[in-house]
Regions:
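Positively charged, low-complexity terminal tracts
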Residues: 1-108
Length: 108
C-alpha cells in the first residue's frame, strides 16, 4: 500500500434508508489509488483522534463509464481554470499512456 498526502480535499457521503454517513478528508489525510486485476481501488484515510477510512472498488467497465461521463460533463461546462486544469490534464495523459503501453497480447 502506497499512501500519498491529500493536497486538496475530498468528501464522502453514504445515504442508507435508515442512516446517513459523511466525512471530509483534507490536507492532514492521505490517499491510495491503484489498479487491480478487476478494476481500481481508491482509499481515503484520516488518522488521529477522528480516525476514518473509506475505500471504493470500481470494476473496469464502471470506471470507464465514470471517466466517459466526466469527459462529457467537462465538455458541456465552462473551462476549468488552469490551476486545476493542468494537473488534471497531466494525470489524464499519464493514464492514457499507461493504458496504451499495457495492452495484453492475445493468447495462442
Amino acid at each position: 500500500m502506497s499512501m500519498h498526502p491529500i493536497v486538496d480535499k475530498g468528501e464522502v457521503a453514504i445515504d442508507f434508508p435508515d442512516k446517513y454517513y459523511s466525512g471530509g478528508f483534507g490536507r492532514d489525510c492521505s490517499f491510495e489509488a491503484r489498479a487491480e486485476d478487476e478494476g481500481v481501488l481508491i482509499r481515503l484515510v484520516r488518522g488521529g483522534s477522528d480516525k476514518r477510512a473509506v475505500a471504493i472498488h470500481l470494476h473496469h467497465f464502471l470506471f470507464a463509464g465514470i471517466i466517459e461521463e466526466l469527459a462529457r460533463s467537462l465538455g458541456e461546462r465552462e473551462p476549468i481554470d488552469a490551476v486545476h486544469r493542468d494537473p488534471l490534464l497531466a494525470a489524464a495523459r499519464g493514464l492514457a499512456a499507461a493504458l496504451e503501453r499495457s495492452v495484453p497480447k492475445p493468447a495462442g
